[in-house]
């Protein structure tokens, strides 16, 4: 099968698998799963970074989209790839909350953090996160909108990687992360479902200040991407809200899962 045909088939599979389970629902009151030394067994576990809050920032908190984004992405990863994903005996994904200063951080191939416009890194966070990323870890930050949130985040990540040493770049279209499983031309603009409904189908949550999606990154000395920043989009909402509205699902969730599969395959192969 030609690559384009394979990609089209995979897109249909994403839609078909999810449609078969549309609205399946999960218990959002599930107790938080804090990472422990015995939480890791060689399988993939979605790790959500727990960060300190900046009172002068812009956005929600590290709990945004929890736990459904973590659950749904773990399930789709198991369905759409051959990756071994951790599930418990009742069949729930073993997604984990990981404090940035915990030793468990180093057992996570990837850390996901949402709404980082309100994040604050302490000196201890900075030292630990820098060590984790330079040793092969990966950080994906998502769902922060507009120039104020960007500047707040840029100030914090500069503590970890001063831009003169490790510059932030706009990822070029030929970067491998856009081509690992699906051929992506760009990161799509995905709004939170509440904004999308309330605005009558709008996608830019900060108007003209967030009209353009940015896919930015920080790489190590060997060119390995260590930090992915998807700015002016809410990719994780496309996972969390996949069962709420079929129109939102077909418009945004299929693309959101394509982005996620590409990122995760890049992480696990680099």
Q: Model-flagged regions — what are they?
A:
Residues 15-17:
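N-terminal signal peptide c-region/cleavage motif recognized by signal peptidases
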Residues 1-9:
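Bacterial N-terminal signal peptides that target proteins for export
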Residues 20-110, 116-117, 234-270:
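Aromatic-Pro/Gly-enriched surface loop or interdomain linker
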Residues 68, 72, 76, 124, ...:
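Extracytoplasmic/secreted proteins, especially bacterial periplasmic and envelope-associated proteins
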Residues 83-98, 141-146, 165-174:
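Surface-exposed patches in mature extracellular/periplasmic domains of secreted proteins
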């Amino acid at each position: 099968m030609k690559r384009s045909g394979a990609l089209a088939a995979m897109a249909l599979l994403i839609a078909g698998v999810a449609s078969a389970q549309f609205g399946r629902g999960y218990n959002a009151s599930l107790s938080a799963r804090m990472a422990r030394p015995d939480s890791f067994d060689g399988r993939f576990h979605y790790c959500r970074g727990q960060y300190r809050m900046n009172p002068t920032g812009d956005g929600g908190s590290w709990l945004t989209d929890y736990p459904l984004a973590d659950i749904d992405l773990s399930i789709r990863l198991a369905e759409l790839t051959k990756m071994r994903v951790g599930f418990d005996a009742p069949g729930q994904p073993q997604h984990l909350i990981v404090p940035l200063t915990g030793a468990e951080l180093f057992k996570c191939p990837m850390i996901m953090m949402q709404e980082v416009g309100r994040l604050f890194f302490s000196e201890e966070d900075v030292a630990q996160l820098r060590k984790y990323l330079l040793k092969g870890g990966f950080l994906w930050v998502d769902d922060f909108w507009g120039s104020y949130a960007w500047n707040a985040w840029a100030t914090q990540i500069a503590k970890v990687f001063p831009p003169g040493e490790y510059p932030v770049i706009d990822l070029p279209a030929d970067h491998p992360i856009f081509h690992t499983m699906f051929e992506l031309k760009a990161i799509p603009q995905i709004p939170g479902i509440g904004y999308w409904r309330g605005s009558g189908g709008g996608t830019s949550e900060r108007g003209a200040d967030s009209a353009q999606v940015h896919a930015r990154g920080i790489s190590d000395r060997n060119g390995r991407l260590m930090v992915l920043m998807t700015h002016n989009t809410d990719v994780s909402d496309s996972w969390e809200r996949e069962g709420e509205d079929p129109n939102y699902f077909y418009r945004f969730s299929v693309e959101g899962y394509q982005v996620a599969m590409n990122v995760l395959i890049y992480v696990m192969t680099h």
